[in-house]
């Protein structure tokens, strides 16, 4: 892609997200979401092949349907209340429609159908943007709507997302699809805690983005996209394999890694609000995710295929630009748990 065109696309993507996040007016927030959607399409089609074209078409059709539903909800709210304020959507029909539209944009169940297919059809870098950056704008709107949303609809979507995210990833062999189902599951955790403590939703989103960025950067550096290529990682890059193993354990929420912190705080918050059955159900369903994370760890780290190469280290390196981004992300992804008391005091 032309560097000038790419810089323009990325700038517009950044501007669309920031417009939505800083807006308190529904019309400008909707415009930011549309800028976000339209600039994401050429990013998904960075490589022109039938699969990426199909993925971009699916993404456009789903997001356009969600945008149309959101605009219909805003029009209904305007007819009844006469205002465009995000924090004052008083009509229950409009509120539920807007909530479902934003859930579709987030890719939470039962509106998740497009996420695995689109993620699998594109390269790793567009998939990384899709599963991380594209969550910011819709979640910022849900954060502002948290006081008057339909909690039953949020709980239903959250529990379904955790269940489908764990269940759908069990029989997958493609890493992008596994990470897509992992994203659906994490969206469920964020949605359920949203009515109780929106700050914990932001904490969970921050740690999820750090973990997902780390995994995608490792997979991009090692050119790994499937379980079969994952089995060769230990022979080629042992250090990267160990980093991938610890990051996957953190993504599954295993102590004493960073991913355990948001789950711990969310379960504590739910039990503090006299909700016992829901956190217990969430913790049990999260074991499904932990199973396929352990499956990835087994294939990458605990299985070494027979090899005729006696050299344990790579002797010929490609010319890559060294960066501090990945080590920093890996450190943050695995070592933030001791900060839990300080973070819980800031809530």
Curated annotation (Swiss-Prot):
Keywords: Electron transport, Membrane, Mitochondrion, Mitochondrion inner membrane, NAD, Respiratory chain, Translocase, Transmembrane, Transmembrane helix, Transport, Ubiquinone
Entry's Gene Ontology cellular component terms: mitochondrial inner membrane; respiratory chain complex I
InterPro entries membership: Complex_I_Subunit_2, NADH_DH_su2_C, NADH_UbQ_OxRdtase_chain2, ND/Mrp_TM
Short name of one Pfam family: NADH_dehy_S2_C
Coiled coil, from the record: none
Source domain of life: Eukaryota
Catalytic activity: a ubiquinone + NADH + 5 H(+)(in) = a ubiquinol + NAD(+) + 4 H(+)(out)
Root EC class: translocase
Entry membrane topology: Multi-pass membrane protein
Gene Ontology biological process terms, A to Z: mitochondrial electron transport, NADH to ubiquinone; mitochondrial respiratory chain complex I assembly; reactive oxygen species metabolic process
Subcellular location: Mitochondrion inner membrane
Main location: mitochondrion
General function of this protein: Core subunit of the mitochondrial membrane respiratory chain NADH dehydrogenase (Complex I) which catalyzes electron transfer from NADH through the respiratory chain, using ubiquinone as an electron acceptor. Essential for the catalytic activity and assembly of complex I.
Family as reported in the entry's similarity comment: Belongs to the complex I subunit 2 family.
Subunit-structure text: Core subunit of respiratory chain NADH dehydrogenase (Complex I) which is composed of 45 different subunits. Interacts with TMEM242.
Protein name: NADH-ubiquinone oxidoreductase chain 2
């Amino acid at each position: 892609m032309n560097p000038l065109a790419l810089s323009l696309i990325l700038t517009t993507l950044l501007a669309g997200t920031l417009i939505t996040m800083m807006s308190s007016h529904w019309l400008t927030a909707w415009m930011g979401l549309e800028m976000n959607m339209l600039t994401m399409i050429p990013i998904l089609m960075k490589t022109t092949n039938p699969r990426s074209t199909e993925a971009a078409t699916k993404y456009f059709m789903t997001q356009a349907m969600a945008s149309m539903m959101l605009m219909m909800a805003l029009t209904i709210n305007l007819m009844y209340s006469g205002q465009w304020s995000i924090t004052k959507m008083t009509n229950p029909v409009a509120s539920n429609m807007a909530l479902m539209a934003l859930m579709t944009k987030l890719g939470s169940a039962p509106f998740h159908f497009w996420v695995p297919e689109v993620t699998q059809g594109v390269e790793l870098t567009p998939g990384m943007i899709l599963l991380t950056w594209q969550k910011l704008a819709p979640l910022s709107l849900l954060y502002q709507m948290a006081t008057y949303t339909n909690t039953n609809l949020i709980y239903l979507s959250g529990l379904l997302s955790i269940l489908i995210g764990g269940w759908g990833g069990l029989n997958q062999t493609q890493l992008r699809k596994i990470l897509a189902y992992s994203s659906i599951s994490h969206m469920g955790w964020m949605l359920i805690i949203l009515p109780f403590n929106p700050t914990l939703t932001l904490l969970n989103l921050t740690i999820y983005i750090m973990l997902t960025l780390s995994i995608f950067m490792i997979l991009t550096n090692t050119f790994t996209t499937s379980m079969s290529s994952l089995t060769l990682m230990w022979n080629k890059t042992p250090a990267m394999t160990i980093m991938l193993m610890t990051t996957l354990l953190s993504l599954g929420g295993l102590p004493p890694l960073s991913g355990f912190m948001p789950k711990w705080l969310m379960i504590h918050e739910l039990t503090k609000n006299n909700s016992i059955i829901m956190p217990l159900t969430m913790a049990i369903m999260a074991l499904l995710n932990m199973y396929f994370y352990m499956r990835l760890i087994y294939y990458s780290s605990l299985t070494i295929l027979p090899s005729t190469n006696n050299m344990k280290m790579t002797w010929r390196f490609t010319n890559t630009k060294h960066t501090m981004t990945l080590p920093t992300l890996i450190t943050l992804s695995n070592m933030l748990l001791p900060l839990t008391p300080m973070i819980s005091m800031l809530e």
